[in-house]
From Swiss-Prot:
Organism lineage: Bacteria, Pseudomonadati, Pseudomonadota, Alphaproteobacteria, Hyphomicrobiales
Cellular location(s): Cytoplasm
PANTHER family for the chain: HISTIDINE--TRNA LIGASE, MITOCHONDRIAL-RELATED (PTHR43707:SF1), HISTIDYL-TRNA SYNTHETASE (PTHR43707)
Gene that this polypeptide is encoded by: hisZ
Function: Required for the first step of histidine biosynthesis. May allow the feedback regulation of ATP phosphoribosyltransferase activity by histidine.
Keyword tags: Amino-acid biosynthesis, Cytoplasm, Histidine biosynthesis
GO cellular component terms, semicolon-separated: cytoplasm
UniProt key word Cytoplasm: yes
Protein name (database record): ATP phosphoribosyltransferase regulatory subunit
């Protein structure tokens, strides 16, 4: 069998045909990318896996670890009109304990579409069609989550803005969420800060704290430019202190845990969420209207809603995801079975420097996993 890393493999050519049929411009993205956008916006797991280097000017560069960020940066650089659909098919590079560090991804980024529900449904339908074109008989599991419903739940519970931001950053990471909820209940013990730092944190003196942190880093032989800056660390320490001073009623936290435990088929999800909101006097009306509109659009796209699992705890701990998130998985492989993943990232292009808000939704397919699955089923 031809390795999936080859651009001459049958799966590569088959996916090129699928992408060309979906009204998306196939773009070429340079292998060498500025590292900062990935370091600033990617999740902790991806940051650890990036291959970093520098040019002769000392600028941080990396081998392309994924496509969404560079495709969006390319769109901004070209000052391209929207709506616009981009397709990609090429190598990405990530450090792995096992297996090759170079592998292929394919996907579509849909930028600037006015109809959010329709473009969400189209993204899922396109991803599913691409997967089924390569592995038509494989048992698949589709899991869907919604960052905006979780955000609406936090607001309805009356959580302060700081805690909402913290919990949203943990959404989709079960361990991080457990730690955050333990902090919110006051049951998570924190290591005490040295007294000199603790005084500045208690006073909210971000400038003084940053100066002291920088001095300590230099004394320890650590470059202040490596990783988070002293200012960022100071801001995070003060934020943690403010959050630690807030404790929330146990009953409200119990409701949040009940919400995160909701896992039903998509055809029952809106009914389940509306009943949960009504039973607990929670105002989720606006976000549930959008949720229902998307579910209707998914049904109109020809996807059986009963075949999709809505998991209220499923998300991605990245600041730029704003709504839909989904994965298409190999139902026979629970350990490493994610074949494709996608979601809505309406904040990303603004964070990358776009002059105006540009909504976006897209997906990526893991070709190595898909080829392995297709080979097993042949």
């Amino acid at each position: 069998m031809t390795m999936v890393g080859s651009r001459t493999s049958p799966i590569f050519n088959a996916l090129r045909v699928e992408l060309n049929a979906r009204e998306a411009e196939l773009v070429e993205i340079p292998l060498i990318q500025p590292a900062d956008p990935f370091l600033d916006m990617a999740g902790e797991d991806l940051r650890r896996r990036i291959f970093l280097t520098e040019n002769e000017n000392g600028d941080s560069l990396c081998l392309r670890p994924e496509f969404t960020i560079p495709v969006c940066r390319n769109h901004i650089a070209l000052n391209a009109a929207t709506p616009k659909r981009y397709a990609y098919l090429g190598e990405v590079f990530r450090q792995r304990r096992d297996g090759a560090a170079e592998f292929l991804q394919a996907g579509i980024e849909d930028l600037g579409a006015a109809d959010e529900a329709a473009s969400d449904a189209r993204s899922l339908a396109d991803a599913l069609s691409c997967v089924k074109a390569i592995a038509p008989d494989a048992p698949l599991e589709i899991v869907l989550g919604d960052q905006s419903v979780f955000a609406g739940m936090l607001k309805a519970l009356g959580l302060p803005q700081g805690w909402r931001k913290k919990l949203l950053r943990s959404f989709g990471d079960a361990h991080s969420m457990d730690l955050a909820l333990a902090e919110l209940t006051g049951t998570q013990r924190r290591d005490p800060l040295p007294e000199s730092l603790a005084v500045l944190v208690a006073e909210g003196d971000e400038i003084g704290l940053a100066r002291m942190l920088e001095a300590e880093m230099l004394e320890a032989g650590i470059s202040p430019g490596a990783g988070r800056t002293p200012v960022e660390i100071a801001r995070r320490l003060i934020e943690k202190e403010d959050l630690a001073a807030t404790h929330f009623p146990a009953a409200a936290l119990d409701l949040l845990r009940q919400f995160l435990a909701i896992r039903v088929s998509l055809d029952m999800a809106a009914v389940t969420l509306r009943a949960f909101a009504a039973d607990n006097a929670l105002d989720l009306g606006a976000v549930l209207q959008k949720f229902e509109a998307r579910a209707d659009a998914i049904a109109q796209a020809g996807i059986e809603m009963k075949d999709i699992i809505y998991d209220a705890s499923f998300g991605r701990p990245l600041d730029y995801y704003t709504g839909l998130v989904y994965e298409i998985r190999d139902a026979s492989n629970r350990q490493d079975g994610v074949l494709a993943g996608g979601g809505r990232y309406d904040r990303l292009l603004t964070m990358l420097g776009a002059c105006e808000a540009i909504p976006g939704v897209g997906f990526s397919i893991w070709l190595d996993r898909l080829q392995a699955l297709a080979g097993e089923k042949q």
